[in-house]
Amino acid sequence: MKKLDQRGAAAFEFCIVAMAIFALMFAAFDWGRYAITVQSLRALANAGARAMMVNCYNDAAIGKTISPSTCTADYLTPTEKQAIAPFLYANGLSPTVTTTVVGSALVVTASLPGFQMIFSSLWGTSLNAPSTFTKIPF
């Protein structure tokens, strides 16, 4: 029986292992992008809630003589939003901050509609367009 040539076996094994390592590395980067996006959205929702409390809560609101639906404006300017969460504005994306009334609470929601996971085929579409909220009792 003729002995087979072993040249190139190490390079082939490295290619197989390197593909798995690079896939795991890029998956970790993707999860990191998602985590920093959600954290930035939380910071933006919290800042929007603070701005709303400073600008909207007055004697009538504290005395509950007005409806919470009168305080649903966005009190942050685009420049302030970008200063609070600059990562959200990468690649031309723009986060949205909305305030809605749920019962007797105001809910400030921050979302990033254009965000896409790099490995969406691996994670699915449930992680695209993340959103987070902050509730304020009124």
Give the residues covered by each predicted segment:
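Alpha-helical hydrophobic helix detector
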Residues: 10-30
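N-terminal leader/signal peptides at the extreme start of proteins
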Residues: 1-7
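Small-residue (primarily alanine) positions within well-ordered alpha-helices
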Residues: 11, 15, 45-52
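Short, conserved structural patches
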Residues: 38, 47-138
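Membrane-proximal amphipathic alpha-helices
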Residues: 30-42
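Short coil/turn residues that cap or connect secondary-structure elements
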Residues: 16, 33-36, 56
